[in-house]
C-alpha cells in the first residue's frame, strides 16, 4: 500500500477518494464500465484512506522485522543484502526493478538449498504473508519456476486472508487501485482521468485471457498479470495470451 507521501495523510487523501466516489456514482465517469465502477465504489469507504495508509505502515514494520530476523546470523553478526535486478531494469519512472534477499557469503554462511525458505526473497516473503500485493508487470517477470512460486504464495495469502486482508478486510484498496482513484479525483475531465488511471492491460493468469484495461475487477488479486499497452502485442506472442 501507499504511505501518506503519495496523496497526503488520511485527512487530506480521504476527500480525494470521496470525490472519486462521487464521480463514479454521478455519471462523470460513465465511460468506465459499470461493473468496474461498482467494484471501486465498494472499496471507497469513509475510512478507505486511513486503512490504506495504516496498512502501508504495518507492511513497513513487517518488512523491517523480516530484515532483522533474516539478516542476523546465528552468531549475531549481520548478513549483507543482495539486490537482484530483473526484466526491465529501470522502469519509466526511473525506479530500479529488483528482488532483495539475504546475501549468503560462502563456507561460513552457506547458501541454503534451492527449495529452502531461507532462499526466499523478501519480496516473496511479503507476498506470502499478505503484506505486499502481487503485482507482476511484463516484461519484468522472474523465471517460470519463481513466478509459479510467487503465484502460489499470493493465492494462499488471498484465500487464507493473511496480513493486510486479515487486518483491514477484502475491501482494502490495493496500491495500484488507490493511485488510480486519486488520479480519477484529480483529473480536470473524464478523458484525462481515465487515460491516467488505467494504463495497463490485465491478464487472468488462470486462463491467460486478456481482460483489458477495465476487466481486472473480476480477477482475484493473486491472478492478475499486468502489461503496458505498448507491450501487449509482444507479450501476447511470447506468453501465448488469449484474446477475450
Each model region followed by its residue ranges:
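Small beta-barrel nucleic-acid-binding modules, primarily SNase/OB-fold domains
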Residues: 1-244
Amino acid at each position: 500500500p501507499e504511505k501518506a507521501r503519495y496523496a497526503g495523510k488520511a485527512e487530506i487523501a480521504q476527500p480525494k477518494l470521496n470525490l472519486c466516489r462521487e464521480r463514479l456514482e454521478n455519471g462523470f465517469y460513465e465511460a468506465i464500465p459499470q461493473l468496474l465502477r461498482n467494484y471501486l465504489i465498494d472499496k471507497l469507504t469513509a475510512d478507505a484512506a486511513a486503512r490504506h495508509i495504516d496498512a502501508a505502515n504495518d507492511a513497513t514494520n513487517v518488512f523491517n522485522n523480516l530484515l532483522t530476523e533474516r539478516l542476523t546470523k546465528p552468531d549475531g553478526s549481520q548478513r549483507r543484502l543482495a539486490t537482484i535486478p530483473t526484466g526491465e531494469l529501470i522502469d519509466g519512472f526511473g525506479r530500479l526493478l529488483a528482488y532483495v534477499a539475504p546475501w549468503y557469503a560462502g563456507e561460513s554462511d552457506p547458501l541454503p538449498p534451492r527449495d529452502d525458505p531461507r532462499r526466499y526473497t523478501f519480496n516473496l516473503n511479503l507476498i506470502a504473508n499478505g503484506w505486499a500485493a502481487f503485482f507482476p508487470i511484463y516484461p519484468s517477470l522472474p523465471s517460470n519456476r519463481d513466478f509459479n512460486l510467487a503465484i502460489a504464495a499470493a493465492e494462499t495469502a488471498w484465500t487464507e486472508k493473511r496480513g493486510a486482508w486479515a487486518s483491514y478486510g477484502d475491501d482494502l484498496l490495493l496500491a495500484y487501485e488507490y493511485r488510480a482513484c486519486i488520479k480519477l479525483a484529480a483529473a480536470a475531465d473524464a478523458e484525462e482521468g481515465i487515460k491516467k488511471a488505467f494504463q495497463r492491460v490485465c491478464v487472468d493468469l488462470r486462463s491467460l485471457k486478456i481482460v483489458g484495461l477495465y476487466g481486472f475487477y473480476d480477477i482475484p488479486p493473486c491472478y492478475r498479470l499486468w502489461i503496458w499497452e505498448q507491450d501487449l502485442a509482444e507479450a501476447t506472442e511470447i506468453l501465448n495470451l488469449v484474446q477475450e
